[in-house]
Each structure stands twice: as structure tokens, then as C-alpha cells.
């Protein structure tokens, strides 16, 4: 089954939205509308099968007490709370997993069997539960026949002691793949009456559920060292670099990412309200280095050579990302699949880059070396992309503007 996806530019999308809003505003007037100018577009909202609701009450009864207890203790988003809910659902015969793929799926063999029947073009059905960290779960009712997979997606949210269905929609999966890395990935455009009333359209969904188990130590290493960095507006895990040669690692992106961790507040150096004006800040040497130096074994001189440093007034020039440097807000994540303890006290983590948005459980693999510190902190030592003919490009990333590009766009503004 081929992936059919409508891609659109994030920036162009903003322009389209603005244009539609202008039309909406300009359409308001004292003159009565002319009936013969009104046209109607009808989209067939797929009916939600009644049998998809049959086991919902049973599922709610299984886990409602756990949600009530977690809410009372203000632990509804706690990992161990989610684990207990997933395991409880599994004990009652349901394949279940968490929405961040941090907990082993229960009853994975049922999902594997269903995937095999999809490949064999046999008829089958299954319910899979995805427990959210926002206080609820998504119930996927899947039905396959002739190699096609129909999805009924229902979201249930816990609130004030009750679990209520917020929205239900359905679609036929346009992309379906049970990957060699143990992920079930599927996507499509789903419709619901509630959504259509608000948007007059459907919503794209890209689902990635880890079916095969993963060692808990690997998950802990991911949560401790890789997930806090991630891939949003930085290239730490995209380019090759090490302590002897930091290469193309962008320390301004690192400053953006690490500033809130060090100062426990949002970064104050923001873009100008006028999108046509490029903001420029001079950050005191100590303030800038306090963010970077704890996370890298790098001296001031080397850091200055990788940035724009003003020796006269001892400041780092800093230009926040502007409109031309925004990214579409869909990102992959790194998942540790192995590690080595090195003789010098460092750890070498081997990880796959998983990108649900494009249905790829291994965009590429990379090795990250980290140095755990006695104070509980960490220094990042290196990153290396593992060469492979199957490696894909990092389509989610927008690099910062070069000095030349910045001048061409903003000039002396």
C-alpha cells in the first residue's frame, strides 16, 4: 500500500490562513447576502460503526479507578501511572501501549497476528489502546479485509471523576507498515462530525506504535540523555562532531535549547515583533558560557571560534531565529537500541531515529557518546551518523541563516 500524503509549506500555510481570515472579515457587511451566490460543498462523513463502541464501557471500567487515584495524587502524567494503566489493560486482554512508546506493549502477539492477516489479505479485527500522558486514551478499532485497513479512532478523556468520549473519527489507512524495527505505523485522514463542524475538513493522523519490547535500560538512557535534546531547532544528532572537532554543531541552537535548563526560565532573547526586522543581541560572556560549558568539554577560546565573539566588550553576538528559520512542528525522536560502557567512564549509545510523521522507524542510526558527571549532569562528547544506503535526509530541520543570508534578508534593518 502506497503512502499518499498532501504536503504543504508551513510558511505558505500561514499565508493561506491569513488570506482566508481576511476573506471572512471582508465578507461581513450590512448588505444582505444574495442566495444565488451561495454554494455548498458536501463531504461524506463516514458513519461510526456501533460495534466500535461495544467494548468502550468495559475498557473504562478496567482503568477508571487508576485514573481517579492518579488525579487525587496529581500524578496523572507520571510514567509509573501510565505504566500501571497500560499493564492493567493488558491483564484484561487488550494490546496497550503509551503514546510516547516508553512502555512495552501488552499482548503484542495479537498485533503481530493482525499484521500478518493484513499481509495475507484475510479478514480480521483488533482493538489497540494508546494511553496518553494528558489523562485519557485513544482507542483504535482496526478492521482489515482484502489488504485494506479501516480505522475507527476514539479519544477518551478523564475529567472530574469520569471518562468521556471526546471525539470519534474513521478513515481507511493510506499508509500501513509493520516495520523490521518492531513498529506498527499507519496514517490517513480521519473525519468526525465534531471536527468537520469546526474545520470543514478532516485531520491528518500519523500513528507509530512500538509493538516489540525494548529493554528498560535502553528506554532509561533515551529519557536521560537523548530525549531532552531531541531534534527541534538543533542539529546535535544530525551532523558528525566530537570534542576534537565540533564540526557543524551549532552552538546558538544549543544555547536556545539549554538556556531554560540552566536558568529555569524562558530565553529572553527573542525575535523582533516586526518580522521584517532582524534582532541582534550582545550577551555577556559569562551568561553565554554558563549555558554551554557545563554540557560540553570545550574551552572559551574554542567556543568563541565557533560563534561571533566581541573581545572588546566581552560579549557573544546572538541572533534569534526569525520567520525564515521556522520549522514544521513535526519531529522524530531517538530511541536507544544498544550501549557500551567505555573504559574512560563515557557511554556510547546506539540509537535509531524514529519519525512517525513520515512512517519511518529508522530514518538513520547514530552513535552518541556521553560523559555522565558525578553531580548528576552530563557532557555530550560526540555524535556520529552510522553510514547506510538506507539513510534518509533530515527533512524536518531548518538550519540557522548564514551571515550572508541574514544580511540579504534583513540588511541594516
Regions found by a protein language model. Give the residues of each.
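C-terminal motif of bacterial Sec signal peptides marking the signal peptidase cleavage site
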Residues: 24-27
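Bacterial signal peptide processing site
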Residues: 29-31
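Mature, Sec-exported extracytoplasmic domains of Gram-positive
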Residues: 33-413
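Sec-dependent N-terminal signal peptides
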Residues: 14-21
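Bacterial N-terminal signal peptides that target proteins for export
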Residues: 2-14
Amino acid at each position: 500500500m502506497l503512502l499518499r500524503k498532501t504536503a504543504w509549506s508551513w510558511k505558505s500555510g500561514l499565508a493561506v490562513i491569513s488570506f482566508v481570515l481576511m476573506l471572512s472579515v471582508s465578507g461581513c457587511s450590512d448588505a444582505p447576502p444574495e442566495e444565488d451566490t451561495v454554494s455548498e460543498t458536501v463531504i461524506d462523513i463516514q458513519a461510526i460503526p456501533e460495534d466500535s463502541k461495544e467494548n468502550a464501557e468495559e475498557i473504562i471500567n478496567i482503568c477508571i479507578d487508576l485514573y481517579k487515584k492518579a488525579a487525587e495524587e496529581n500524578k496523572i502524567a507520571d510514567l509509573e501511572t501510565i505504566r500501571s494503566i497500560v499493564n492493567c489493560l493488558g491483564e484484561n486482554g487488550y494490546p496497550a501501549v503509551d503514546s510516547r512508546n516508553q512502555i512495552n506493549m501488552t499482548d503484542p502477539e495479537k498485533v503481530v497476528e493482525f499484521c500478518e492477516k493484513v499481509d495475507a489479505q484475510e479478514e480480521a479485527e483488533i482493538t489497540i489502546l494508546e494511553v496518553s500522558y494528558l489523562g485519557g486514551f485513544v482507542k483504535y478499532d482496526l478492521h482489515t479485509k482484502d489488504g485494506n485497513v479501516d480505522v475507527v479512532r476514539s479519544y477518551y478523556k478523564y475529567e472530574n471523576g469520569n471518562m468521556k468520549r471526546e471525539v470519534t473519527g474513521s478513515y481507511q489507512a493510506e499508509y500501513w507498515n509493520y516495520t523490521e524495527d518492531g513498529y506498527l505505523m499507519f496514517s490517513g485522514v480521519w473525519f468526525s462530525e465534531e471536527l468537520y463542524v469546526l474545520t470543514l475538513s478532516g485531520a491528518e493522523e500519523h500513528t507509530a506504535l512500538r509493538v516489540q519490547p525494548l529493554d528498560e535500560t535502553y528506554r532509561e538512557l533515551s529519557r536521560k540523555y537523548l530525549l531532552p535534546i531531541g531534534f527541534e531547532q538543533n542539529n546535535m544528532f544530525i551532523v558528525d562532531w566530537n570534542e576534537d572537532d565540533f564540526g557543524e554543531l551549532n552552538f546558538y541552537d544549543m544555547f536556545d535549547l539549554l538556556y531554560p535548563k540552566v536558568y529555569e526560565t524562558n530565553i529572553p532573547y527573542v525575535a523582533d515583533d516586526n518580522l521584517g526586522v532582524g534582532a541582534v543581541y550582545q550577551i555577556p560572556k559569562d551568561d553565554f558560557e554558563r549555558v554551554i560549558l557545563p554540557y560540553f568539554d570545550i574551552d572559551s577560546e574554542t567556543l568563541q571560534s565557533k560563534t561571533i565573539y566581541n573581545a572588546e566588550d566581552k560579549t557573544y553576538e546572538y541572533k534569534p531565529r526569525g520567520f525564515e528559520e521556522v520549522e514544521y512542528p513535526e519531529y522524530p525522536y531517538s530511541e536507544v537500541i544498544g550501549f557500551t560502557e567505555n573504559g574512560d567512564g563515557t557511554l556510547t549509545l546506539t540509537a535509531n531515529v524514529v519519525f512517525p510523521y513520515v512512517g519511518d522507524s529508522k530514518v538513520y542510526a547514530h552513535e552518541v557518546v556521553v560523559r555522565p558527571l558525578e553531580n548528576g549532569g552530563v557532557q555530550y562528547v560526540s555524535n556520529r551518523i552510522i553510514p547506510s544506503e538506507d539513510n534518509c535526509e533530515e527533512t524536518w530541520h531548518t538550519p540557522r541563516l548564514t551571515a550572508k543570508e541574514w544580511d540579504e534578508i534583513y540588511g541594516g534593518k
